């Protein structure tokens, strides 16, 4: 249960910090703010995990996992969770604020659980259900005080729902990928964040015409520092969530 509480609280913190970053220049006046902040968030998460796994002497485990069927499944899951889920999430924060975004997107574990039961025939233990409920409650409690709408409610809700669907489907694929010993929760998370970060920087950002915006964000210490802080909270949240 402690992992569920930690994951929920840290994810709410991640959301609030990103909302603050999006209110600062250059994000506040940039049409590509959602895309760029999502790309930088996942890229920083990948760098944090690279250092984390290197310090634990586990990079070789990740390298081996990449070449397995389970590792490739995690890569596919990363595309759903990163470019689709994370972009929708940041769009929602930009349009309807951190509070409403967190409250809506917090239901992605519930969707993932429902899909896992339906598709993978998994059975939920009572303590897992309680941990899930506690995580959802922690996110809502952390984010409730920052509920506000600053843009399009329609686009904001659609973005949040894209996050729920992307992350929920990602969770099912990850659960399947981690069924054997080839991929554990830490290697899966590193593969996930590295795949997502590289996909953003190599494909999504250039194709979205956001290279200039990304450069401006990287040279803005205040905004970039907040994105990095949010990424640190997000990485810790992911680690707790994968262990829950």
What is each model feature region?
Residues 115, 127-146:
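Hydrophobic transmembrane alpha-helices of multi-pass small-molecule transport proteins
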Residues 19-31, 60-63, 94, 143-153, ...:
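Membrane-interface helix termini and inter-helical loops of multi-pass transporters
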Residues 21, 37, 92, 118-124, ...:
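Hydrophobic/aromatic residues within transmembrane alpha-helices
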Residues 12, 16, 43, 79-83, ...:
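Hydrophobic/small/kink-forming positions within alpha-helical transmembrane segments
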């Amino acid at each position: 249960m402690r992992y569920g509480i930690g994951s929920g609280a840290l994810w709410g913190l991640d959301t609030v910090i990103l909302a603050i970053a999006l209110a600062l220049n250059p994000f506040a006046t940039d049409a590509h703010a959602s895309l760029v902040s999502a790309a930088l968030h996942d890229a920083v998460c990948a760098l944090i995990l690279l250092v984390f796994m290197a310090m634990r002497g586990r990079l070789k485990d990740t390298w081996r996992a990449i070449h397995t069927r389970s590792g490739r499944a995690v890569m596919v899951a990363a595309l759903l969770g990163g470019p689709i889920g994370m972009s929708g999430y940041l769009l929602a924060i930009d349009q309807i604020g951190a509070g409403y975004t967190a409250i809506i997107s917090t239901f992605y574990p519930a969707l993932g659980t429902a899909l896992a039961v339906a598709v993978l025939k998994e059975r939920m233990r009572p303590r897992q259900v309680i941990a899930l409920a506690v995580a959802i409650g922690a996110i809502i409690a952390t984010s409730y005080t920052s509920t506000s709408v600053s843009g399009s409610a329609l686009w904001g809700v659609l973005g949040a729902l894209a996050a729920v669907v992307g992350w929920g489907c990602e969770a099912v694929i990850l659960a399947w990928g981690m069924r054997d010993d080839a991929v554990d929760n830490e290697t899966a998370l590193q593969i996930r964040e590295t795949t997502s970060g590289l996909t953003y920087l190599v494909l999504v950002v250039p194709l979205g015409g956001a290279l200039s915006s990304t450069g401006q964000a990287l040279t803005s210490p205040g905004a970039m520092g907040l994105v990095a802080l949010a990424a640190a909270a997000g990485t810790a949240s992911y680690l707790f969530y994968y262990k829950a």
